[in-house]
Amino acid sequence: MSTYFVGDLHGCFDELQKLLERVRFDPVKDKLYFTGDLIARGEKSLECLRFVKNLGTSAQTVLGNHDLHLLACAYGIKKVKTRDNLTALFAAPDFDELMDWLRQQPLLVHNDHFNFSLVHAGISPDWDMATAQACAREVEAVLRQGDYRALLRQMYDSRPERWSSDLQGIERLRYSINVFTRMRFCYADHRLDFDCKLPLEQAPSELMPWFACDNPLFKTENIIFGHWASLVDCPTPGNIYALDTGCAWGNRMTLLRWDDKRIFSQSAVKKTGVF
């Protein structure tokens, strides 16, 4: 049995299949995890969603910002962007079934046995693991059983910028969504910044990557995430695994075999997105 993690798919189905062939992935005995953003930009979002869904318990994804935006589009809250290449997905006969399945996916997977935490973008510098898990469960409960349409409608805001245990209602849910699916840079006081999308070496000096903030969790927890394609080839601490390497932008897709921490890469078949 092997455990694998794959960075953001963004509809790049062919590259995923090539990677899985290389490592001889066996859904009968292996487990495959995804960092979210299964869809958008690449040409085979429908195939990616169907594949992950049909793997059943052999696969697990977390929700990314593009996945949540897809849900907002599916329920008529937002309009689909042409550049996201989602025409085939929206026309699929199993579209509603796929959206129901996607809405059930978590924001955080924490595994004590294999000693890892999986998220799309990151974990708040103000959270310990118990708080991170609690905040993830709060959002997931609304998406799965609550007034998810209202949540999807109100999630498009970068406020609040800073965590407080006193946060309630939509502000608390929105902060959690932004941390788990959108965060990249933070200030020294742990305020979130959503304006800067530059590579680390070009970012303003007052900003730091979320995992460089002062939080004991970031020194002890193995955290696996995607989302940040411009981190490609940038060094991170040994327990921090950034797996989005920009396949949809013409770079490559990355797979991590957890058993021996070996990295496998597959070059993009073609560039389909705009970075």
From Swiss-Prot:
The keyword Hydrolase applies. Hydrolyzes diadenosine 5',5'''-P1,P4-tetraphosphate to yield ADP. This is Bis(5'-nucleosyl)-tetraphosphatase, symmetrical. InterPro entries: ApaH, Calcineurin-like_PHP_ApaH, Metallo-depent_PP-like. It comes from the Bacteria. It is an enzyme of class 3 (hydrolase). Belongs to the Ap4A hydrolase family. It comes from Actinobacillus succinogenes (strain ATCC 55618 / DSM 22257 / CCUG 43843 / 130Z). It holds the Pfam family Metallophos. It catalyses: P(1),P(4)-bis(5'-adenosyl) tetraphosphate + H2O = 2 ADP + 2 H(+).
